[in-house]
Design a protein with these regions (language model features):
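Active-site neighborhoods and metal-handling regions in enzymes and metal-associated proteins
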Residues: 1-219
Length: 219
């Protein structure tokens, strides 16, 4: 708490550069509190406050190929009960959609499933009475192609997955009235018989995050 969003942006950028990364995939997003409910927040100049979450959307480039990862952490190091409830709902969708990806599945099918799951989550969280109104709290697609460009070129956005493709999975819920914005994004490689999560080593469960933050405080 007390740090500016741009200080954490700089910390990530510095660590990438110090490990030999020449370029980032895009400008790092560090969005605290209500700022995390803005999809492509770019200011990164607000003060971080205890009790809020901070959403990171970041990625490095390696041999011209890009990563695109989102994680959401509690600034205090501990999720509140409500934050944990919303976070776990998003994480469940993240994991279910990742497990759905395989050759032959279409992006339309993937989005339909994600929309249904997030709508159900909104109802169970007390945000909505009708899951069909999910766009109030989730207003983007489940992912995009990833490669030489962060949003890699696909002529038709509704396509069928084939081995060798890389696609992001990034469900989110954005609740301005509660200053909660959560997105969990992984990069998924489509294989011959399923998929591989290329970003599986990036911690994302509540327990992993709280344990990591208890041992690695930035003062």
């Amino acid at each position: 708490a007390g740090m500016k969003e741009y200080e954490l942006e700089a910390y990530f950028d510095f660590n990438c550069k110090s490990k030999g990364v020449k370029d980032l995939a895009f400008n790092t997003i560090a969005a605290a509190g209500k700022n995390a409910t803005v999809l492509h927040y770019v200011d990164n100049n607000a003060e971080m406050k205890d009790g809020d979450l901070i959403l990171f959307d970041l990625g490095a480039q390696y041999k011209y190929y890009n990563a695109d990862i989102s994680r959401t952490f509690p600034i205090s190091g501990k999720f509140t009960a409500r934050q944990k409830e919303v976070y776990n709902a998003v994480l469940k969708v993240n994991e279910e959609i990742i497990n759905t990806i395989k050759p032959g599945i279409t992006t339309a099918e993937l989005n339909a499933k994600a929309n249904d799951l997030l709508g159900e989550a909104c109802v169970s969280l007390g945000l909505l009475e009708d899951k069909k109104d999910f766009r109030k709290y989730y207003f983007h697609s489940i992912g995009h192609s990833l490669g030489l460009d962060t949003h890699d070129v696909i002529i038709d956005r509704n396509f069928t997955f084939e081995p060798g493709m890389v696609y992001t999975v990034e469900p989110g819920l954005y609740i301005p009235d509660e200053s909660i914005g959560i997105r969990i994004e992984d990069d998924i490689l489509v294989t011959e018989d399923g998929s591989i999560n290329l970003t599986k080593d990036m911690i994302k469960t509540v327990e992993e995050i709280e344990d990591f933050m208890s041992r690695n405080r930035i003062n």
